[in-house]
């Protein structure tokens, strides 16, 4: 309902014929740059998973999985579609759930860690041209960075605490607990048999995931994953910069009239709207509203902001959904090499275990 109201209001600010004309007359060289930089971002994101997984899955399958992840990530609210990555690497490529969850959590938090300093740099670059509230945005970016660094540091202990809590909740164990949360859980009666079994499996998965997070730190992945995450973010926003230029060329805009730091801030606001629970199917309505709000504050006329929001969203969705659907169909095809992939995974895991023991 909220999305429908937003769509109605935003579409009332423009003529549909203008939107069609913008899409038809899109600047093809800039559109090609969008595709190329998006491809570079795909490789970088896949490489990050490859590093986090210690090479358990080859780059090409990870690129396919990432395309599927891109298909679902904006389709559902609060980016829960990104969990499709966990399903794909476990169900289709035989990766253990704990390794999949550890790589998923670490990639997510490193994404947030990477965007915070980039936001601060963009705010510094625009300087006095930013409207009132720039200091608040800088403070939020710094807070985001600090929070994410704390989350990285406490991820392993937090997962173990959650595992302990669920284990106690499942068994109703009355032994002394290590925290008020587990102590409160221990005073309760055991959960029903079915629920207890489910909670027990979840507790074991979380404990194993914590072990995998610790193993990642021991492998020294923090710096390379952070650097790759910076590249991922720069590719994403660089691609959108080219896409925005492509749709605004028919309206008289040039590279010199589109400041990259300004575009970065505007796109960042629209992207953050996808994490909200009110995010609609494919984000239509909420995305354009956040885009329009951000870019009008940064100096674009309302009509141009609305037009560019719809045009960039439509083109990017066609690009992501088209490639993601093809990748999904390819992955879901019956493949005779699935058992081999699982054997390769088990072999790689045992080799990694032996190497850590050397």
Model-identified regions with their sequence ranges:
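Membrane-water interface at loop-to-transmembrane-helix junctions
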Residues: 184-230
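Short helix-coil transition sites and intra-membrane helix breaks within transmembrane domains
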Residues: 38-47, 52-54, 73-83, 274-287
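Alpha-helical transmembrane segments of multi-pass membrane proteins
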Residues: 37-42, 69-74, 232, 267-275, ...
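Transmembrane helix-loop-helix hairpins in multi-pass inner-membrane proteins
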Residues: 1-21, 69-194, 284-358
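Membrane-interfacial helix-loop connectors
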Residues: 57, 244-311
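Alpha-helical transmembrane segments of integral membrane proteins
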Residues: 1, 29-33, 60-65, 136-140, ...
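Hydrophobic faces of transmembrane alpha-helices in multi-pass small-molecule transporters and flippases
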Residues: 31-35, 67-75, 101, 105, ...
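Helix-loop-helix hairpins and the membrane-proximal interhelical loops
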Residues: 6-57, 217-261
């Amino acid at each position: 309902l909220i999305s429908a109201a937003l769509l109605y209001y935003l579409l009332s600010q423009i003529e549909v014929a203008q939107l069609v004309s913008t899409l038809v007359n899109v600047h093809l060289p800039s559109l090609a740059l969008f595709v190329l930089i998006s491809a570079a971002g795909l490789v970088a994101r896949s490489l990050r998973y490859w590093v986090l997984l210690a090479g358990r899955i080859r780059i090409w399958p990870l690129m396919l999985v990432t395309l599927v992840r891109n298909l679902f990530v904006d389709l559902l609210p609060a980016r829960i579609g990104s969990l499709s990555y966990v399903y794909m690497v476990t169900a289709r490529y035989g990766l253990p759930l704990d390794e999949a969850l550890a790589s998923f959590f670490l990639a997510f938090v490193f994404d947030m860690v990477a965007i915070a300093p980039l936001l601060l740099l963009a705010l510094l670059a625009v300087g006095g041209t930013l409207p009132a509230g720039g200091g608040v945005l800088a403070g939020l970016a710094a807070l985001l960075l600090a929070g994410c660094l704390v989350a990285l540091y406490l991820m392993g202990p937090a997962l173990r605490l959650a595992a302990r809590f669920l284990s106690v909740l499942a068994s109703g164990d009355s032994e002394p607990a290590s925290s008020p949360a587990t102590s409160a859980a221990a005073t309760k009666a055991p959960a029903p048999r079915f629920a207890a079994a489910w909670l027990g499996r979840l507790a074991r998965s979380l404990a194993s995931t914590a072990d995998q997070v610790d193993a990642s730190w021991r492998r020294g992945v923090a710096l390379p994953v952070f650097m790759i995450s910076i590249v991922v973010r720069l590719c994403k926003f660089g691609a959108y910069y080219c896409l925005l230029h492509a749709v605004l060329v028919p309206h008289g805009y040039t590279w010199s009239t589109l400041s990259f730091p300004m575009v970065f801030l505007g796109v960042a606001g629209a992207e953050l709207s996808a994490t909200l629970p009110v995010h609609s199917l494919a984000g239509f309505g909420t995305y354009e509203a956040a885009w329009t709000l951000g870019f009008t504050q940064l100096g674009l006329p309302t009509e141009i902001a609305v037009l560019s929001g719809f045009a960039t969203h439509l083109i990017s969705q066609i690009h992501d959904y088209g490639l993601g659907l093809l990748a999904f169909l390819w992955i879901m095809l019956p493949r005779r090499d699935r058992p081999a992939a699982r054997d390769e995974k088990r072999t790689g895991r045992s080799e990694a275990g032996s190497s850590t023991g050397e």
